[in-house]
């Protein structure tokens, strides 16, 4: 059941990254991109109606996950991996 949750999170993240248009990627300096990546967390929340498929898959309401470059924060645990802009990060959930 956790695999379904992880796959759903990765799918949502992939759809989110594909929805953004690549504006100015050729002109963007690598240093600017790196600064943006250091300060950016992506939040993935699971919740909603009690009858949803995720609730049936034993997912607790209010679970929030972040793609982190470094280790997971306090009260977070490593739940897998996530991709953002072609890079792989840690998926930390609380």
Swiss-Prot record:
Homology family: Belongs to the alpha-defensin family.
Entry coiled-coil feature ranges: none
Keyword terms of this UniProt record: Antibiotic, Antimicrobial, Defensin, Disulfide bond, Fungicide, Phosphoprotein, Secreted, Signal
Signal peptide stretch: 1-19
GO cellular component: extracellular space
BP terms from Gene Ontology: antibacterial humoral response; antimicrobial humoral immune response mediated by antimicrobial peptide; cellular response to lipopolysaccharide; defense response to fungus; defense response to Gram-negative bacterium; defense response to Gram-positive bacterium; disruption of plasma membrane integrity in another organism; innate immune response in mucosa
Subcellular location: Secreted
Domain of life: Eukaryota
Name assigned to this protein: Neutrophil antibiotic peptide NP-1
The keyword Phosphoprotein belongs to this UniProt entry's keyword annotation: yes
Source species taxonomy: Eukaryota, Metazoa, Chordata, Craniata, Vertebrata
Tissue/organ expression: Highest expression in bone marrow and to a much lesser extent in small intestine.
Function: Active in vitro against S.aureus, fungi, Gram-positive and Gram-negative bacteria and to a lesser extent against an enveloped virus.
Pfam families in UniProt: Defensin_1, Defensin_propep
Residues passing through the membrane, by range: none
Species the sequence originates in: Rattus norvegicus
Sites bearing Phosphotyrosine, chain numbering: 84
SUPFAM superfamilies in alphabetical order: Defensin-like (SSF57392)
Disulfide partners: 65-93, 67-82, 72-92
Residue positions assigned to the propeptide: 20-62
């Amino acid at each position: 059941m956790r695999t379904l949750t992880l796959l759903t999170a990765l799918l949502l993240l992939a759809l989110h990254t594909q929805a953004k248009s690549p504006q100015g990627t050729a002109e963007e300096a690598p240093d600017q991109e790196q600064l943006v990546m250091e300060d950016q967390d992506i939040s993935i929340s699971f919740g909603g109606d009690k009858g949803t498929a995720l609730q049936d898959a034993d997912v607790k309401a209010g679970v929030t996950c972040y793609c982190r470059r470094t280790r997971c924060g306090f009260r977070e645990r490593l739940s897998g991996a996530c991709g953002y802009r072609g890079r792989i990060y840690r998926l930390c959930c609380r």
